[in-house]
Amino acid sequence: MRILSSLKTFSQSRLSWLLLLAFVVFFTLCAMYFQHVMLLAPCVMCIYERIAMLGIGVAALIGAIAPQNPVVRWLGFAAWGASSYKGLMLAIEHVNYQFNPSPFATCDLFVTFPAWAPLNQWAPNLFEAYGDCSKVVWQFLTLSMPQWLVVIFAANLLALAIFVVAQLAKTSR
């Protein structure tokens, strides 16, 4: 229980939320390196996964606003969970495009954003897709990029679950 109490206290610090934000910044910079230095063309699914990652960053910013306020902290947890779950579902779908190809299951040709937020027009260097979802263009330790994203988003959900359990556990005084 001491570990859960420590995790609850840590989640009430701004440092914990800024650390989550730092991970998002790191992974986004990795994506930019892959795209602009290694010249790996991002596909539609890559862009959607990138947005899910940025959603985790927004969750971190929400939590960092007032981490000692339970309402703000739980809003941060909810946004973290929603973005991580959506990212995991997108990454799993992307892995299926790569390793279980089907003429009936293909990704879109173009990213689609709401008319009120055409991100690919506002920031094309970050949100424009021109790659093929089914191609494996990069691997590290035998895993493709979407497979790594499955690991990353699943790890986020696991970390979130641990922090939620810590919030609900009774703390000894």
Swiss-Prot record:
Q: Name one GO molecular function term.
A: electron transfer activity
Q: Which residues cross the membrane?
A: 17-33, 52-67, 75-92, 148-166
Is the keyword Oxidoreductase in the record? yes
Look up the record and give one Gene Ontology term from the biological process aspect. Answer: protein folding
- Which keywords does the record carry? Cell inner membrane, Cell membrane, Chaperone, Disulfide bond, Electron transport, Membrane, Oxidoreductase, Redox-active center, Transmembrane, Transmembrane helix, Transport
Which Pfam families does the record cross-reference, listed alphabetically? Answer: DsbB
Identify the GO cellular component terms for this protein: plasma membrane
- Residue ranges, Cytoplasmic side: 1-16, 68-74, 167-173
> Which residues point to the Periplasmic side?
34-51, 93-147
Q: List the disulfide bonds.
A: C43-C46, C107-C133
The annotated topology with respect to the bilayer is: Multi-pass membrane protein
List the subcellular locations. Cell inner membrane
Query: Could you tell me what this protein does?
Result: Required for disulfide bond formation in some periplasmic proteins. Acts by oxidizing the DsbA protein.
Family the entry assigns? Belongs to the DsbB family.
Which NCBIfam families does its entry note? PRK01749.1
Q: What is this protein called?
A: Disulfide bond formation protein B
List the taxonomic lineage: Bacteria, Pseudomonadati, Pseudomonadota, Gammaproteobacteria, Vibrionales
